[in-house]
Structures are given as structure tokens and as C-alpha cells.
Amino acid sequence: MCSHGHSHNCAAEHIPEVPGDDVYRYDMVSYIDMEKVTTLNESVDGAGKKVFKVMEKRDDRLEYVESDCDHELLFNIPFTGHVRLTGLSIIGDEDGSHPAKIRLFKDREAMSFDDCSIEADQEIDLKQDPQGLVDYPLKASKFGNIHNLSILVDANFGEDETKIYYIGLRGEFQHEFRQRIAIATYESRAQLKDHKNEIPDAVAKGLF
């Protein structure tokens, strides 16, 4: 068994099941910077990022992540800009490998297991949910404007390893990073200057 060297004592939240299917849209996957997603303690390198699928493929059992030497998994999920997250869904098997508890941390890039000894922004007790019918709301005060999410799977339902098929995030994109906006603005102005001679004088004076 691995020893990651962290502890916690915060009370987790109990979330009721949401009846019916497709009650929420978990479509924030398009705003995840997938190339930079990392998963610690995954048994197969690169498997962790594959559980962030489009909602229509959430029932796919061919791609999944399984923990390596104990039940813990730590996902570091950067976004392509600032986002507001309002809820999540997690699909596993209906057995002891399904995650039972997660701890969420916002805007802490490249977290390690040692970093998880700090207080989480939210803790959630999970239900065994092989069909993705349970929605777990996230705290608006904590996840209203973030650029990175870390998810620690802190416990499962009794197996040595944890297996996850799908993690869906719902919310909305807020805005791009300021640095990226500044670069785009600079490049746009540079292109205009390159074509200055093609712009009538009256218009050019108003632009430059």
C-alpha cells in the first residue's frame, strides 16, 4: 500500500440523488486544458485524463482510470480560462472500487498528495453510481471563478484500488486569461499596423 503522508478531519457533505437522466449538462470538458491534466497514482500513465469525456460517452466502459498501489487518486485539472463550476458527476462500478469520498481544491496547480493535508474547499461523500444519475452541487462561494481544480479521491467502498469511468463537470466559461487576451490584442493591433497603408487616411488616424 502506498503512503502519501497526509491527513484530514473535515466533515463531508451528503448529497441527495437526482431523479431521472440528463437533468444536468456536464459539458465543461471542452474548457479543460487536456494536455496539462495530470493524475497521480494512476496504474496506467495518461489514463486519468480519459475519464473526462463528453457527456454522450459517459457510459463508455472501454476507457477508465484505476489507482495503482492503493485507493487514492489525485486529479489536477487546468482550464483554458476562468470558469464557474456548479456541479459534478462521477461514474464507477457498483462494487468496492467505486470512489466513496472526494476532496476538492481550487487554483492549486500541480498538487501532490503531501499538499492535500490542507483544508479542502469542499468535501463530498459519494454514492455508488454506475449510471451517472447523481449530481453533486459545488459551493458557489468557492468555485465561482477558478482556473484549476484538483480532485482527491480519498476513499472508496472497500477495494484496494479505485476505478473511475467518468468525471463530468457542469458550469460555464467565464473569460480567458488576461495574459492571453493581452497577447491577442497586441497581435491584432500589429496586424492592423501591417496593413496601415491599405486603410484610408481618415480611418487610419482613428486607429493609430
From Swiss-Prot:
<dbReference type="GO" id="GO:0005634">
    <property type="term" value="C:nucleus"/>
</dbReference>
<dbReference type="InterPro" id="IPR010400">
    <property type="entry name" value="PITH_dom"/>
</dbReference>
<protein>
    <recommendedName>
        <fullName>PITH domain-containing protein ZK353.9</fullName>
    </recommendedName>
</protein>
<comment type="similarity">
    <text>Belongs to the PITHD1 family.</text>
</comment>
<dbReference type="InterPro" id="IPR045099">
    <property type="entry name" value="PITH1-like"/>
</dbReference>
<feature type="domain" description="PITH">
    <location>
        <begin position="17"/>
        <end position="189"/>
    </location>
</feature>
<dbReference type="InterPro" id="IPR008979">
    <property type="entry name" value="Galactose-bd-like_sf"/>
</dbReference>
<dbReference type="Pfam" id="PF06201">
    <property type="entry name" value="PITH"/>
</dbReference>
<dbReference type="InterPro" id="IPR037047">
    <property type="entry name" value="PITH_dom_sf"/>
</dbReference>
<dbReference type="GO" id="GO:0005737">
    <property type="term" value="C:cytoplasm"/>
</dbReference>
